[in-house]
Structure formats: structure tokens, C-alpha cells
């Protein structure tokens, strides 16, 4: 059973897998360990997550949202195009993106993803360095 850890951050998120007693960072589809916690909706209704969404913050601010994690549990919603999303829904899109990247990187299906802020987040962050 493959289990990954996810550090869901306000600005960036990342995933890791435990192998041989160590946390191994999982690169996203763009080769980076950090995935921006940003979601955007194209004009035709397609949802985009991560770096491509972040790239749209300037060109499509009305269809792109970031920093939504801090509003989880408040009931605040964000409008992308014609649809409204709760921060929990937007966060789930970021998590789904990291799980898909992990499946592609590891070549196997992910059966469980855990986001335990203190334990998993600390371990993932301790393995991350801007020099990777």
C-alpha cells in the first residue's frame, strides 16, 4: 500500500513518500517539489492547479484564486467564472493534483494521502531545500 504525506500550505504545497525510513520529496509535473496552492478556471470551465494557475494570477485575476487555505472553516467562498468554491473544495483540488503527480512519479496508485500538519508537514519541509 502506497501512502503519501502532503504538506498543504497557504502559498505552496508538496508531497512526500516514505522509503527506506526516509521521506522522499515528490516532484510535480514541472519538476518542482513545490506546487503553488493556486486554482484557476479557464474560459471554457476547465480547472487548472499549481504553477499554470499561478501564471494566470496577473492575466486572469477574476478567474484565479490563491491564499484560500487561511479561510478554511469560515464559510467564505471564492468565485471562479460562474461557480463558487469553498476553500475546502479548492484545497481538495490542490491535494488531488499532488496525488496525481505522486502516481505519475511513483508509477503506482496512491491508496492513501495524509496531511498531518505537525508530523508530515515537518518531515516534508525538513527534506525540502531551494537547492533541490
Residue ranges: model-predicted function:
Residues 1-36, 41-119:
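N-terminal phosphate-binding loop and flanking beta/alpha elements of the actin-like ATPase fold
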Residues 121-132:
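Positively charged, low-complexity/disordered segments
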Amino acid at each position: 500500500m502506497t501512502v503519501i504525506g502532503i504538506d498543504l500550505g497557504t502559498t505552496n504545497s508538496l508531497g512526500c513518500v516514505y522509503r527506506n525510513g526516509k521521506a522522499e520529496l515528490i516532484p510535480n509535473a514541472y519538476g518542482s517539489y513545490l506546487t503553488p496552492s493556486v486554482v484557476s478556471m479557464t474560459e471554457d470551465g476547465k480547472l487548472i492547479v499549481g504553477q499554470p494557475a499561478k501564471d494566470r494570477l496577473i492575466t486572469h485575476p477574476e478567474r484565479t484564486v490563491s491564499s484560500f487555505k487561511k479561510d478554511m472553516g469560515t464559510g467564505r467562498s471564492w468565485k471562479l467564472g460562474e461557480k463558487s468554491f469553498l476553500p475546502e473544495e479548492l484545497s481538495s483540488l490542490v491535494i488531488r493534483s499532488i496525488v496525481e503527480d505522486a502516481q505519475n512519479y511513483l508509477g503506482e496508485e496512491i491508496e492513501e494521502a495524509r496531511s498531518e500538519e505537525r508530523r508530515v508537514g515537518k518531515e516534508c519541509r525538513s527534506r525540502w531545500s531551494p537547492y533541490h
